[in-house]
Regions:
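Basic, Lys/Arg-rich alpha-helical nucleic-acid-recognition elements, primarily the DNA-binding modules
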Residues: 1-37
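PLD-like (HKD) phosphodiesterase/transphosphatidyltransferase domain
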Residues: 30, 34, 39, 43-124, ...
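Inter-domain helical "communication" segments and dimerization helices
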Residues: 37, 46-71, 80-82, 152-153, ...
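Contiguous mid-protein beta-loop-alpha structural module that forms a pocket-lining wall or clamp
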Residues: 42-44, 106-108, 129-191
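Primarily the HKD phosphodiesterase
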Residues: 85-139, 229-256
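Signature of lipid phosphatidyltransferase scaffolds
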Residues: 165-237, 283-291
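N-terminal accessory interaction module
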Residues: 212-294
């Protein structure tokens, strides 16, 4: 019985009078309940911190466990959406990819011209759903311009990280990486590839893009042996950040849509470079810079 009483003493639930024999007295019930309650809360707090710590470890190891709100918004005010996209076009740092009726392209004309004249490294690729005579943006702005005789979705992608898709009375604003990857592939296979060129693009200066297919399209318009390409991205297996620069050995943009990649040689080593979500290549490119060799 003394072991039990000593245990209760350690918990602060009994008091001991030091005499022979020892005398024990229970503390007041209100005080005892408070002591037990505090002890239980402390244990629960420790358990909570342990659980949070383990969850954080998992979150850093696997991004699929991140409980973030999807970056998808509906904009009901189309004028507001157009004003926003004009501002984003003018401040683009990497590329703009546009597919729309000529009316919308012409509304965006001033912003597109401002971009191509003030940020000459930014790549602008545009597909118009219209008669080419209605397009007011011309080849003087060094734009990759195409025409599609039948309409599809009006899509505007900025820097490979932001997109607005226009519907009849609303627009979707998207920033989810997986959706951007899907839209980029959709744009290339369903919109860009079936369209006919309206201008003959010439690589006069350095161009950047976040889309692997657009980089290869630019490469196809030049002699690959004349090009220098810099790639910023990730090593596919280790996910370590990489930056490599070298010459083009080959590129692949097959009709079946299975492969979109190019081979780069840098410091006598060959690298197979793919785009966002690369699954078989050595490098997953996020930014591709193409220029003529000096």
């Amino acid at each position: 019985i003394y072991d039990v009483l000593n245990s209760l003493k350690l918990k602060g639930l009994v008091e001991i009078k030091q005499e022979r024999p020892q005398k024990f007295r229970a503390v007041e019930p209100k005080i005892a309940l408070q002591i037990l309650s505090n002890d239980l809360l402390a244990k629960l707090s420790n358990i909570k911190q342990t659980i949070f710590s383990e969850i954080e470890k998992l979150r850093t190891q696997d991004r699929s466990l991140l409980l973030e709100e999807p970056n998808v918004w509906i904009i009901r005010n189309l004028d507001k959406a157009k004003q926003k996209i004009k501002s984003l076009i003018e401040s683009a740092n990497v590329d703009i990819v546009v597919s729309s009726p000529s009316s919308l392209v012409n509304e965006l004309k001033d912003s597109i011209v401002f971009l191509t004249r003030n940020r000459k490294n930014v790549t602008a690729a545009i597909v118009c759903y219209c008669d080419e005579s209605k397009v007011q943006v011309n080849s003087n702005e060094a734009i990759l311009l195409k025409q599609r005789p039948t309409p599809s979705l009006p899509i505007i992608m900025i820097d490979g990280t932001y997109c607005i898709v226009f519907a009849e009375d609303y627009s979707l604003e998207l920033g989810e990486p997986e959706l951007m990857r899907i839209l980029s592939d959709f744009f290339y296979y369903s919109i860009w590839r079936p369209s006919k060129p309206l201008t003959k693009f010439k690589l006069d200066q350095e161009k950047t893009t976040s889309h692997i297919w657009l980089a290869i399209e630019i490469m196809k318009m030049s002699k690959k042996e004349d090009l220098t390409v810099k790639v910023n991205g990730f090593e596919r297996k280790s996910r370590s950040v990489v930056e490599i620069e070298g010459s083009i050995v080959d590129y692949k943009l097959d009709p079946q849509g299975i492969f979109k990649n190019f081979t780069l040689i840098s410091n006598e080593k060959k690298y197979l470079v793919g785009g966002l979500g690369a699954s078989v290549e050595d490098i997953e490119a996020r930014l591709i810079t193409i220029s003529k060799k000096k």
